[in-house]
Amino acid sequence: MKSLRQVLRDYLVRRAFVGGYSWDVDKYSLILEVITYSLIPVPVITYLITKSLPLSLMLAPTPALPILLVVIWSTYSVDSVKEGVEWELPFFVVLLDIVHDVGGDITHAFELSGKVGLRWIGREWSIIRRYSLTTNSITKAMQVRARLHPSLEFQRFVNGYVSVWSYSGDVGGYVRSVEGTYLSTLSSRLSSLSRQIIDVVVATVSSLVVLILFVIVTTVLGMNYAILYIVPAVALLLPALIARVYQSIPYIIRMDVIRDKSVYMALGASVMVAAILILYLGVKGVMALMLPPLLFSAMVTRRVNAMRDSIMALPDLMRDISEIVKAGVGIGAAIERILDNPYPPPLIAYLRGINQLSGNAEVNGPWIMRFAMGVLRELSSLGSPSRALDRLVEVFLELKTIMMGINYGSRSLQLLNYSLPAVFAGITYISRFVVQTISSIIENAPYALIGLSIPGINAVLMPLLLTAYIVSLSVALLSSLLGNLSINPTIKYVIPIPLTLALMLITVEIPVLA
């Protein structure tokens, strides 16, 4: 019978082979065994100390927690390999088609994958080369890796390619036949993912607004108004949703821009100013909470818009270069000729960088931009195949269509973002109306209503303002994630935040119609 250490070791070995990892399984299994056995007496010791049987029973699964955490960690590691390879596989197929056009094969495409930003595919190539040291054959090593790989798409592609390579030899036709399928599948996955995210976000925010109304009604009808502070805590679920949405958006289409230290310094200073104003001014100082998002968005708006324009201009760039190359000009000379065209400044800067003599200028920007510049840089050494450039035009047109489709699909979320000021202003007005109406009834009643406490509007307003701020900021970030595919919101996405706070404070000052 196997010991716990042997069982854990065998499990980690299998997961390491599937994921292509080099884990120290002996060390991990030994540590897990020691921790698990040391936790077995915990329920018994707890019962001897507390004499509480329910508490001891609750702690009974404690010894299994380390094993559960390792299972979750190993599963997440393997799933990361699967998702990363499946997102990059369509672009690798495009790169392979380009390499075939100049007489290369899949090994050359694997070699180039790391240079053009396909890091997960490049990782697979390093694993295949390691396997080839024992199989003495690249094709056998590819089949071994495909057999162990967690992605069925990668398995089918590699096995199909090796089969065609071994028999008919028409690998170019095979690649062209699956290229369109992979690109259309990529488009469908991204579109369905964006729709699911939008539906979940809208449902969550709508449910939160209903919860706020329910808590307000129960509060003004006599419950302790401290329960209102539960609502901001519930609203903090939205930042967790933002983190999950950010992870759900594939890095291949995210527009992450580089932020310098001045942005973080300004953000920190604005947070300190807002905190000081709230301490001194109380409820009215909450208006200062608009400073951090407004200042941050003002500093990144130009950069985000320029980067988005650069990505949207990639199909036109590839088309212009393709037309010049077809006239018999090399890619380097073609890039020099189009530098005077009215392209966005970041795109011009990237083109100047890759056209230097060294050709090794680092591209700091979104993954799409790194892939485009990397392919252009490598094409100059592949002989400037015009057909490859035409294929790149189609690829970037497809990506542009996908990104525009996600943007249009998020319009409902953007409408929700701009409707939040009116929603929260209406909630504030209704709260004042109900509070003042019931207070007037109690004051004019001929008898005492014992046990009925009506909170003041200021007691209701502070948690409402905090909730409105959290919800509005979260929806602004979510709108930016699905509109610009960036966690950096531009001005148009954060405008509802100060509008929400201002309208709520104005609503408190205007008279209530009795």
Q: Where do the protein language model's features map onto the residues?
A:
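Juxtamembrane boundary at the C-terminal end of a transmembrane helix
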Residues: 506-514
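Membrane-helix interface and helix-disruption motif detector
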Residues: 24, 47-56, 219-228, 277-285, ...
